Curated annotation (Swiss-Prot):
Pathway membership: Purine metabolism; IMP biosynthesis via de novo pathway; 5-amino-1-(5-phospho-D-ribosyl)imidazole from N(2)-formyl-N(1)-(5-phospho-D-ribosyl)glycinamide: step 2/2
Known EC number: 6.3.3.1
Gene Ontology biological process terms from the UniProt entry: 'de novo' IMP biosynthetic process; adenine biosynthetic process
Native source species: Methylococcus capsulatus (strain ATCC 33009 / NCIMB 11132 / Bath)
Record localization: Cytoplasm
Reaction it catalyzes: 2-formamido-N(1)-(5-O-phospho-beta-D-ribosyl)acetamidine + ATP = 5-amino-1-(5-phospho-beta-D-ribosyl)imidazole + ADP + phosphate + H(+)
Protein's name in the database: Phosphoribosylformylglycinamidine cyclo-ligase
InterPro entries listed in its UniProt record: PurM-like_C_dom, PurM-like_C_sf, PurM-like_N, PurM-like_N_sf, PurM_cligase
Family to which this protein belongs: Belongs to the AIR synthase family.
Amino acid sequence: MKTENPLSFDYKSAGVDIAAGNALVERIKPAARKTVRPGVLAGLGGFGSLFELPVDRYRKPVLVAGTDGVGTKLRLAIESGRHGGVGIDLVAMCANDIVVQGAEPLFFLDYYATGKLDVDVAASVIAGIAQGCERAGCALVGGETAEMPGMYAGGDYDLAGFCVGVVEKEAIIDGSRVRPGDRLIGLASSGPHSNGYSLIRKIVGHSGLGLDAPVAGRALGDWLLEPTRIYVKPLLELLKSVEVHALAHITGGGITENLPRVLPVGTAARIDTAAWTMPEIFRWLQRHGGVETPEMFRTFNCGVGMIVCVAPEDEARTLEALSSLGERAFAVGEIIAGEPAVHYV
């Protein structure tokens, strides 16, 4: 005897809501439109994103691409329900990486993955991404929202970003001009940025304090969820008037690991840790986590989010220019002879 199967499955019953995805696209279109810049040839929703290179402004244009994420800072955002800032973080991590080679960010794409799509949460994140793109001067031209039931628990989500920029071939900053005697200038960070959060979360958990606990006049959560500073516009403006020998984005690994990445063979860096005041959040983390000072500088930015290397004769005007552009800049050290490494004094 033949029996009829009473079940009738569809994609939504399997955990993927196409209608919710479409609703999200409509929600984020106004935010994406605010980021449009010359070169954008199509809006969101196509199979691919189109961008016309500004070849009239370059003799030999070179594309520079970067990709990154926000790491476990997302866990704090999810637990606190504060999602917009991590969108800014995502753009910052990618755009700051490519500007260190002298590149002007052109466009950005994002990847948002979750187990069950919450349109409000995703829209908040992507609104933050659009805000970050405005700060970096790049266009949000597309992205992917992946709803993957069974892959992520509850309201968890993950982010990845992709940024493409352009630089004149002769103007690429690769560290090759760095010489002993060059000066190092630090740009203040806004906090831990988007690195070291696995250790941060461990310390916070050990402390037994909630994100609303006061730390130096601010809630702990406000310190930890402060968006990563985007240095793109002031640095691009600086490059118009100063020959920058190297730039180092101080991310995971701190100054200890990141500064040597831009130093040529035969050079090292001497950093004066008394040249700036370490923000209170880092002192709090060191105190509550019992973190040794070398480990602090190898894990966190410790208040310095970007380092600029210039010739000695350009130090004063670089500091003046960065200050006039709204950055807190301070002389932090110099280049010395030696193998690529950081020596703290």
